[in-house]
From Swiss-Prot:
Multifunctional regulator of fatty acid metabolism. It comes from Shewanella frigidimarina (strain NCIMB 400). PROSITE patterns: HTH_GNTR (PS50949). The keyword DNA-binding applies. One of its GO terms (cellular component) is cytoplasm. GO terms for molecular function: DNA binding; DNA-binding transcription factor activity; fatty-acyl-CoA binding. Homodimer. Residues 6-74 form the HTH gntR-type domain. This is Fatty acid metabolism regulator protein.
Amino acid sequence: MIINAKGPASFAEKYIVRSIWENKFPPGSILPAERELSELIGVTRTTLREVLQRLARDGWLKIQHGKPTQVNNFWETSGLNILETIADLNPDGFPLLVDQLMAARGNVSNIYFRASIRHNPEKVVEVLAGIHSLENDAEAYATFDYQLHHTLAFASGNPLYVLILNGFKGLYNRVGRYYFSSQEARELTMRFYLKLEKLAQDKNYSDVPALMRTNGIESGKMWQKLRDDLPAEMGHDKS
């Protein structure tokens, strides 16, 4: 098992998670005793204990006082916060994971974009004013696009959408910088921003679904043109 990690805790976490992913510690099984596991991984028991607590919070493990640590079925117990971990565990499946991420974000954003213009059009106009001074580069577009979604999710009146977005953040930032490295993708996105700005200025929330649908189709086609050249290292966590 080859693991790239910056320190003992990171190594231990990646070792255990990869062992779960590769079914060496299958769902429902009991982890080795703390002393045995710390010797196996090569970390102190204190470090291991901290790692186990963190993995339990993320849904990988079940820790109960006085009982051995049990491996969970993470598909049933974890949240969006493990998206980046899954990408790191399965780099070959990264393009498909991104497809699924974009589809999920698109479905959710359809709701809060419309709701934000309906309930708080002034806030939408305010944040979209930033497009007129937006630097024409990948980093600026990726940053602005995430900020736009975050602001509109808040403006929709349902803060749960913000929590969903937070789960996408790390992975989306990686993909966003790659997507917006394309001049054609930036131009497509700017046209969408301008149309959205006009709807917000007119307080026309009724036409938002049609705009989102059209943009989803066009950006989806753009992504398909770009995904085959997706750098392999993008699926790897650097931590």
